[in-house]
Amino acid sequence: MASSADREKSLETALAQIDRQFGKGSVMRLGSDERAPVAVIPTGSVALDVALGIGGLPRGRIVEIYGPESSGKTTLTLHAIANAQRAGGIAAFIDAEHALDPEYAKKLGVDIDALLVSQPDTGEQALEIADMLVRSGSIDLVVIDSVAALVPRAEIEGEMGDSHVGLQARLMSQALRKLTGGLNQTQTTMIFINQLREKIGVFFGSPETTAGGKALKFYASVRLDIRRIETLKDGTDAVGNRTRVKVVKNKMAPPFKQAEFDILYGTGISREGSLIDFGVEHEIVRKSGAWYTYDGDQLGQGKENSRKHLLNNPEIAAEIEQKIKVKLGLVKDPNAVADAPADSAPAPVAAVAPKASARKSA
C-alpha cells in the first residue's frame, strides 16, 4: 500500500489536472476559505427574510413558491424582482399563464422598462428560454409563472380529451437536470410559482400536492407554502390580507419556520408593518398602550399610523431593519470593532445582496 506522502502527492497531481481541464475551483476542500458568503435577494418582508435564516432567497438556487389561488404568490415574486433590480440586477419573468399585470408590478416597485418578459406558447419553449437566459450569465433572477401552465407541445397540438400521462412531469425533470448546473455557475436564482392540486382517495394526511411531478420538490433548495389567513379591514372595507408563509424545505438553514406579514391591496407586502411587529418582538420598537416609539421618538398612535410614519420616513425604517438583522445575526454589525481578538467566535455570515458586478459569464 502506498505511503501517506505518496497518496497526498498523487491527490495533488490529480487536483492540478482537474483545475487545468475544468477550471480553478472545480474541486475544493469543504472547509476552505474560498467560498463566498451566501448571497441573497431580499423577499420584501423582514419576517420572511428572518424565517429563511439567511436574509432572503439564496442566489444560484431553485426556489418553489406554492399555495392556493390569490394567496400572494405572484406578489411575493414581484417584490423579489424589485429588490433584485434595486441592487443593480437584471430580472426576467416568464409568464406562462399570460396574466402579468404591468401596472400592479409597477406599484410594487418593479422597473417594468428593465424587466424582461416572455409569454411562451409551450412548456418546452418556456424552459428553453429560461435555460438560454441563465446561460447568458447576465441574469440575476428568473421567475416562471407557473409550473401548472407549462403545457407540453404534444398536449397543445393534440385533441381535447387526449391522454398525456406524465408528459409534464418528464418535461420538468429533464429541464431541471439541465438548469441546476447553470444556475450555480452564474449565481442566478430561479423561482417557480406553483399551484395546488388534490389527490383523489386520500383519507390520511394532506390530500394536497403540487403540479409538475416530484422533480421540482427534489431540485428546489427552498420551498415556500404561502396561505391567506385573515382579511384586513378598514371599518367594513377589506384593504388587504394577513399572510402566513411556511418554509417547508430549506437547504440553507433550518426549515419549518413560519413568517406572517400583511399584503395590502394595490401596494403589496407591508414592509413597514413587518418592521413594527418584529421591532416590538425584539424590543427595538417600544409599545406603550396604543403608542409606538423608537429611540425615544414617537412613531404614532396605533399600528396603522406608525406604519404610515415609517413609510414617510424610509431612513428610520432602514435603521430599524438593520438593527433587527444585526440582532438576529443575519448581517454583521457595521459598528463592531474591526480588530476583534483572533480567538473570539466568528461573526455570522453576512447576507449579501445581488450586484451586477458579481455576475460571471457562463
Swiss-Prot record:
GO biological process: DNA recombination; DNA repair; SOS response
Annotated protein name in UniProt: Protein RecA
Domain of life where this protein originates: Bacteria
SUPFAM superfamilies membership: P-loop containing nucleoside triphosphate hydrolases, RecA protein, C-terminal domain
GO molecular function: ATP binding; ATP hydrolysis activity; ATP-dependent DNA damage sensor activity; damaged DNA binding; single-stranded DNA binding
Bias (Low complexity) ranges: 337-356
Stated role: Can catalyze the hydrolysis of ATP in the presence of single-stranded DNA, the ATP-dependent uptake of single-stranded DNA by duplex DNA, and the ATP-dependent hybridization of homologous single-stranded DNAs. It interacts with LexA causing its activation and leading to its autocatalytic cleavage.
Binding site for ATP: G67, P68, E69, S70, S71, G72, K73, T74
Matches recorded under PANTHER family: MITOCHONDRIAL DNA REPAIR PROTEIN RECA HOMOLOG-RELATED, RECA
A Pfam entry, by short name: RecA_C
UniProt-annotated location(s): Cytoplasm
Location, primary (coarse class): cytoplasm
Annotated source species: Clavibacter michiganensis subsp. michiganensis (strain NCPPB 382)
Database matches in SMART domains: AAA
Entry similarity comment: Belongs to the RecA family.
Disordered: region residues: 337-362
Keyword terms of this UniProt record: ATP-binding, Cytoplasm, DNA damage, DNA recombination, DNA repair, DNA-binding, Nucleotide-binding, SOS response
GO cellular component, one term: cytosol
